[in-house]
């Protein structure tokens, strides 16, 4: 990790709602994977964007390709998922929604079904081992793979929504935003919504996607990932902002990811400020803590130092995130109770 966050931000109970499994793999876990697969000739520099470095969004997607080569069997997925969950818990995250695109790898016999089952097994094992975190899973649709695969993924997600005892709660739409068009995936997303899956969609991650965003906001999604170019100052439109505000759709904010991936020029120019000042629901997230060398404590500290938030304001930001989770009501109530219990000792 680049810098240690202060104790207050570490102790702060947190909710993480935008975390891609493969992008969240830490330096230490990468080390183990690289050692296990020397024939791939992969170096650390290929899997993480170090401090002060910037990459284009395209280069960031190249990093994921490398990570996918390292994580290609059930054994890898189990190890990676468990370590990611443990690391979030160690950082004071009390509730986590992980997301990942189910993949099949013929060489290792991995199927999409087994991919999801293995992530669920990792979640189960962490719970059994007493790791202090509640974890749910969003099945991801990679937009690059087109409408047919999207429909198959939705079908899988639907099956797991019914069979995973509440662990699978929703669907994520992600992948390279410059590939494909949302209109081709609309039917699959609508089907997901109809069967009770919550939708977290990456929207307006790159400029000039007004038509697609307009279309997808009509669904509407339950949360927006990034939403970097929604407002008119950055090439979005008033009508997009109105839609988002009218429907009160929470925005998943990923500060470090956007700055290191160069979709935002600097922290102080981040769109968090625009939405936060409007009083719109925002939740701070890491996106890919491994790739971008960050953690959620750091993201909170960055937001506080960049935008002058008091500890009280930071606490409220963290607590409000409970309401934006896809967790069932009893879980939300339990989390509220946890926050209330911790407030006195942490917020002095």
From Swiss-Prot:
Cofactor: Zn(2+)
E.C. number: 3.5.4.-
UniProt keyword list: Hydrolase, Metal-binding, Nucleotide metabolism, Zinc
Site (Important for catalytic activity) residue list: 226
Cofactor note: Binds 1 zinc ion per subunit.
Catalytic reactions on record: N(6)-methyl-AMP + H2O + H(+) = IMP + methylamine
Lineage: superkingdom: Eukaryota
Keyword ATP-binding: no
UniProt keyword Hydrolase present: yes
InterPro entries assigned to the protein according to its UniProt record, in alphabetical order: A_deaminase_dom, Ado/ade_deaminase, Metal_Hydrolase
Family, similarity comment: Belongs to the metallo-dependent hydrolases superfamily. Adenosine and AMP deaminases family.
Subunit structure of this chain's protein: Monomer.
Entry protein name: N6-Methyl-AMP deaminase
Annotated source species: Danio rerio
Source organism phylogeny: Eukaryota, Metazoa, Chordata, Craniata, Vertebrata
Gene designation: mapda
């Amino acid at each position: 990790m680049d810098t240690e966050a202060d104790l207050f931000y570490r102790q702060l109970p947190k909710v993480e709602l935008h975390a891609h499994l493969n992008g969240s793999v830490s330096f230490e876990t990468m080390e183990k994977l690289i050692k296990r697969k020397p024939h791939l000739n992969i170096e650390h520099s290929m899997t993480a964007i170090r401090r002060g470095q910037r990459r284009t969004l395209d280069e960031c997607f190249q990093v994921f390709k490398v990570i996918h080569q390292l994580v290609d069997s059930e054994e890898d997925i189990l190890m990676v998922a468990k370590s990611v969950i443990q690391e979030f818990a160690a950082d004071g995250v009390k509730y986590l929604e992980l997301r990942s695109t189910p993949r099949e790898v013929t060489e290792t016999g991995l199927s999409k079904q087994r991919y999801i089952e293995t992530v669920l097994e990792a979640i189960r094992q962490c719970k059994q081992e007493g790791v202090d975190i509640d974890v749910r899973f969003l099945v991801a649709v990679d937009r690059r793979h087109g409408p047919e695969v999207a429909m198959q993924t939705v079908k899988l997600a639907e099956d797991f929504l019914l069979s995973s005892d509440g662990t699978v709660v929703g669907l994520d739409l992600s992948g390279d935003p410059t590939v494909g068009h949302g209109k081709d995936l609309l039917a699959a997303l609508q089907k997901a919504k109809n069967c009770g899956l919550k939708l977290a969609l990456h929207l307006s991650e790159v400029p000039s996607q007004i038509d697609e965003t307009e279309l997808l906001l009509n669904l509407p999604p339950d949360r927006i990932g990034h939403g970097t170019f929604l407002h008119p100052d950055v090439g979005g439109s008033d009508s997009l902002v109105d839609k988002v505000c009218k429907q009160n759709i929470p925005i998943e904010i990923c500060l470090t990811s956007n700055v290191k991936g160069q979709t935002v020029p600097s922290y102080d120019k981040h769109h968090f400020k625009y939405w936060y000042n409007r009083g719109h629901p925002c939740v701070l997230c890491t996106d890919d803590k491994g790739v971008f060398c960050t953690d959620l404590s750091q993201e909170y500290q960055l937001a506080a130092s960049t935008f002058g938030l008091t500890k009280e304001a930071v606490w409220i930001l963290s607590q409000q995130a409970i309401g934006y989770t896809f967790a069932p009501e009893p879980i939300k109530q339990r989390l509220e109770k946890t926050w209330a219990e911790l407030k006195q000792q942490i917020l002095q």
